[in-house]
């Protein structure tokens, strides 16, 4: 499988796992009767997503050196920032977006190495 596609899949699964963990944390605001059931559902989805991401990560490490693959995983910062704004209405400051832009520039530089 193409290394870039594999990296994108790892990033997406990791992002999904993070969003599910956030959702599980927010379930504690629910009435106590529903809290545990909802939390466990979101945590189960998070574990599955993160577990699949880890398996694909191991496959990716067979194709790329760790010194190249790991910095490119920083794409997660971009995905999680965008998802947090979209799904949770979280606001990012200009400084945050400049940091995201710097990360994207770094990923671009790393991808030329491949």
From Swiss-Prot:
<feature type="domain" description="EamA">
    <location>
        <begin position="43"/>
        <end position="112"/>
    </location>
</feature>
<feature type="transmembrane region" description="Helical">
    <location>
        <begin position="38"/>
        <end position="58"/>
    </location>
</feature>
<dbReference type="Pfam" id="PF00892">
    <property type="entry name" value="EamA"/>
</dbReference>
<keyword id="KW-0813">Transport</keyword>
<keyword id="KW-0448">Lipopolysaccharide biosynthesis</keyword>
<keyword id="KW-0812">Transmembrane</keyword>
<keyword id="KW-1003">Cell membrane</keyword>
<protein>
    <recommendedName>
        <fullName>Probable 4-amino-4-deoxy-L-arabinose-phosphoundecaprenol flippase subunit ArnE</fullName>
    </recommendedName>
</protein>
<feature type="transmembrane region" description="Helical">
    <location>
        <begin position="94"/>
        <end position="114"/>
    </location>
</feature>
<feature type="transmembrane region" description="Helical">
    <location>
        <begin position="64"/>
        <end position="84"/>
    </location>
</feature>
<dbReference type="GO" id="GO:0009245">
    <property type="term" value="P:lipid A biosynthetic process"/>
</dbReference>
<keyword id="KW-0441">Lipid A biosynthesis</keyword>
<comment type="subunit">
    <text>Heterodimer of ArnE and ArnF.</text>
</comment>
<keyword id="KW-0472">Membrane</keyword>
<comment type="function">
    <text>Translocates 4-amino-4-deoxy-L-arabinose-phosphoundecaprenol (alpha-L-Ara4N-phosphoundecaprenol) from the cytoplasmic to the periplasmic side of the inner membrane.</text>
</comment>
<dbReference type="InterPro" id="IPR022883">
    <property type="entry name" value="Flippase_ArnE"/>
</dbReference>
<dbReference type="GO" id="GO:0009103">
    <property type="term" value="P:lipopolysaccharide biosynthetic process"/>
</dbReference>
<dbReference type="GO" id="GO:0022857">
    <property type="term" value="F:transmembrane transporter activity"/>
</dbReference>
<dbReference type="InterPro" id="IPR000620">
    <property type="entry name" value="EamA_dom"/>
</dbReference>
<dbReference type="InterPro" id="IPR000390">
    <property type="entry name" value="Small_drug/metabolite_transptr"/>
</dbReference>
<dbReference type="GO" id="GO:1901505">
    <property type="term" value="F:carbohydrate derivative transmembrane transporter activity"/>
</dbReference>
<comment type="pathway">
    <text>Bacterial outer membrane biogenesis; lipopolysaccharide biosynthesis.</text>
</comment>
<keyword id="KW-0444">Lipid biosynthesis</keyword>
<dbReference type="GO" id="GO:0005886">
    <property type="term" value="C:plasma membrane"/>
</dbReference>
<comment type="similarity">
    <text>Belongs to the ArnE family.</text>
</comment>
<keyword id="KW-1133">Transmembrane helix</keyword>
<dbReference type="GO" id="GO:0055085">
    <property type="term" value="P:transmembrane transport"/>
</dbReference>
<keyword id="KW-0443">Lipid metabolism</keyword>
<keyword id="KW-0997">Cell inner membrane</keyword>
């Amino acid at each position: 499988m193409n290394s870039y596609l594999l990296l994108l899949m790892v990033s997406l699964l990791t992002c999904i796992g993070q969003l599910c963990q956030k959702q599980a944390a927010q379930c504690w605001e629910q009435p106590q009767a529903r809290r545990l059931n909802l939390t466990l559902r979101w945590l189960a989805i998070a574990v599955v997503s993160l577990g699949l991401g880890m398996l694909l990560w191991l496959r990716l490490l067979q194709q790329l050196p760790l010194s190249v693959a790991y910095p490119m995983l920083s794409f997660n910062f971009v995905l999680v920032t965008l998802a947090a704004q979209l799904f949770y209405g979280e606001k990012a400051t200009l400084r945050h977006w400049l940091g995201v832009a710097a990360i994207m520039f770094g990923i671009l530089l790393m991808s030329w190495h491949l």
